[in-house]
């Protein structure tokens, strides 16, 4: 929308669009998308995901590491960068794993991943259960200047739940997930972030 500020007139060849009630943006950013390449191309590819993003006004996608193999080493990051250069219509930023293979037992080589070009760390879909491992990850991520996006869900509380616990879940006969499943993990991570500065 041209608006009125500083605009005396528009050339006759320009099409003026009334932007009242609309949002003008240079491009949206999706901080949590699942492109699934490599390994799960039948779910989504970098090419298809970037096309969908572009159609929706997203010019940057942050790709979660729930791929096969997971984004837990520099070779996988380089493969993804090659696919991005070849197939993507938008900017795609890979997110690396916090732990090797997203299994929560041993930290991934976070410095190697950062050097290879990841923009954050996550074990997307699975929380980092081990509090000391999460504490160490926060320390390393602080040193690297990259954030961690933990999947805040205590699965011992969420069990087989498929939706928020409450009257709708009960009415539908579906297992609910109590709010405490997220709240407990969030409280732990806040305490760890305060302790580490991460």
Q: How should each PLM-predicted stretch be described?
A:
Residues 20, 41-45, 72-76, 101-105, ...:
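Short secondary-structure boundary/capping elements
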Residues 25, 74-95, 139-150:
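Alpha-helix-loop-beta-strand connector modules within alpha/beta enzyme cores
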Residues 27-33, 61-63, 92-96, 120-123, ...:
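Hydrophobic faces of well-ordered beta-strands that scaffold small-molecule active sites
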Residues 31-44, 65-67, 93-106, 172-180:
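Active-site mouth loops of central-metabolism enzymes
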Residues 65-69, 97, 125-126, 153-154:
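Short, ordered loop/turn segments at secondary-structure junctions
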Residues 105-198:
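Histidine/acidic residue-rich metal-binding segments in metalloenzymes
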